[in-house]
């Protein structure tokens, strides 16, 4: 039996593990961890071990589909592109929106946003970072001048204290959690702050179980203790930051006792957390969507930055503020400018439109475009057409009834994907893309490591790489000269020309290990740790912000007495499009549930595995109860992977005004037995 082994990168979370796809007679038959990969070091999690299983599913999209007489029917590429081209040319730029994709390559995202900006002349381009880590991009950007992980994954092992807040690392980033375990074995102290007693919390030396939405109260109280106990780094504050005195004044109110009343965390635990973090020579903060998906998401992130800066935990090994990105290329999609306010490399639209007009040899709109929530809010009125590439907002976005109404209000909905997702099912035109295993390109992982992916097998039927589809559409619209690429490598060469952080990167230089951006010249070895000498702000100083606690948009009340929070489980990934088509994942669990504390369940007369109705002001879902002491009393938890019991029917679309991220992590709910 002759087997081929094709080195590539896992398509799931943002860790960026190296894997070898096993190919026999043109078919994927297995996945092996890549033994020498610097990120995962020859290990994979359960999702990564079976990441090939969805690729050859029979229900892959193989031809374009066009809606005729209410039904989606097969069509030729020429017919589908002719229809789209004709429609697009009749819309004004502000009437068209683009949802780009954290699932797709850097090359796909670059070409997609370039099409929006050069052919359609709109900055209405966004992607799911809006829903997960837009608070990171804004918060870290304002604090340090760069909205990305400050340190590397391997660097976590150099910490004396690891402070994990709003991240279930052991289930959602298992190969990063492996680093946490190794650090703990060497004596590193672990602090975990989370409303759920997760597998991550079980590894903690100190666990703080807070009420959802009270992160700032707890963080401010920890900093209050640090100031009081003189555990701050006065030298670092003086030489590397500004804004400390204002923060210090704000912190006076946040005694551990005051924060305890807001958060439910015992005052003595807050004091112990402060002393544990503050006494470490090097302390690393890890966080995820448990602090970003709030109406205060940006301020939550900036509070973590405050904590790191006042203790001098920036710019050296084992320190930093380190967001763990949820998707394989959500970092790269942001880097590529798949956002309404920035071009590639986070270059602001108003200030840099002339630069990109020159680079692309065409005029571009100088105005900031619409975000995903704004496009959906204006659908059917200002926005007539939305083009979705590799996203599934009918399951992933909050208040799904509103999303469905918005998408059905459009004159034209184009969906480009590998399966007929819930979103594709309501589309007017569906275009079949290639999966990650069927194309060349690059992903950029959570630690800013740019890595090469390699084609292992052919796409099914007439499916085509996403960037090539966009190029074909541009050619159909008479704009092919703007997309004079024949290979993914040629796309990347243009990326390097217009993206300062990628300027020194080539496919050849990436090799197997990849490179950390910024990598600005061909001699630059890359930058695993940011902000070593100074921050990337205009004056080189880190910005400390005085931040007060604010309640979530929706609090539990007499009508909806429980607090609902949502998230993921280890066996599934986002909207389940891939993992629910993986036999090994589906065999583990393939239906939704709601976690309820035993005392709450007893009061409501609910038994384990009993059907219950969970309702909020936006809708209701019938789902199985899972009685567990791991959830805080008064709080219920639902995973959002399962379309038939969609948690996002219930979630609150209220947004952080600074980044427009929705408040997935907290809303008022009630649970009733059926």
From Swiss-Prot:
Gene inactivation effect: The deletion mutant cannot grow with formate and produces H(2) poorly. The fdhA1-fdhA2 double mutant is unable to utilize formate for either growth or H(2) production.
Keyword Thylakoid in record: no
Catalytic activity field: oxidized coenzyme F420-(gamma-L-Glu)(n) + formate + 2 H(+) = reduced coenzyme F420-(gamma-L-Glu)(n) + CO2
Gene Ontology CC annotation, any one: membrane
Pfam families membership: Molybdop_Fe4S4, Molybdopterin, Molydop_binding
GO MF annotation: an example: 4 iron, 4 sulfur cluster binding
Names of the cofactor(s): [4Fe-4S] cluster; Mo-bis(molybdopterin guanine dinucleotide); Zn(2+)
GO biological process, one term: formate metabolic process
4Fe-4S among keywords: yes
Start and end residues of each 4Fe-4S Mo/W bis-MGD-type domain: 3-59
Lineage top rank: taxon: Archaea
PROSITE patterns tied to this protein: 4FE4S_MOW_BIS_MGD, MOLYBDOPTERIN_PROK_1, MOLYBDOPTERIN_PROK_2
EC annotation from Swiss-Prot or TrEMBL: 1.17.98.3
Disulfide-bond pairs as recorded: none
Residues engaged in binding [4Fe-4S] cluster: 10, 13, 17, 45
UniProt remark on cofactor binding: Binds 1 [4Fe-4S] cluster.
Keywords per UniProt: 4Fe-4S, Iron, Iron-sulfur, Metal-binding, Molybdenum, Oxidoreductase, Selenocysteine, Zinc
SUPFAM superfamilies (UniProt xref): ADC-like, Formate dehydrogenase/DMSO reductase, domains 1-3
Function according to Swiss-Prot or TrEMBL: Catalyzes the oxidation of formate to carbon dioxide, with coenzyme F420 as the electron acceptor. In vitro can also use methyl viologen as electron acceptor.
Note from the entry: The genome of M.maripaludis harbors two sets of genes encoding the F420-dependent formate dehydrogenase (Fdh), fdhA1-fdhB1 (Fdh1 isozyme) and fdhA2-fdhB2 (Fdh2 isozyme). The Fdh1 isozyme is the primary Fdh and the Fdh2 isozyme may not play a major role.
Family, as annotated: Belongs to the prokaryotic molybdopterin-containing oxidoreductase family.
Subunit structure: Dimer of an alpha (FdhA1) and a beta (FdhB1) subunit.
Designated name of the protein: F420-dependent formate dehydrogenase 1 subunit alpha
Organism lineage string: Archaea, Methanobacteriati, Methanobacteriota, Methanomada group, Methanococci
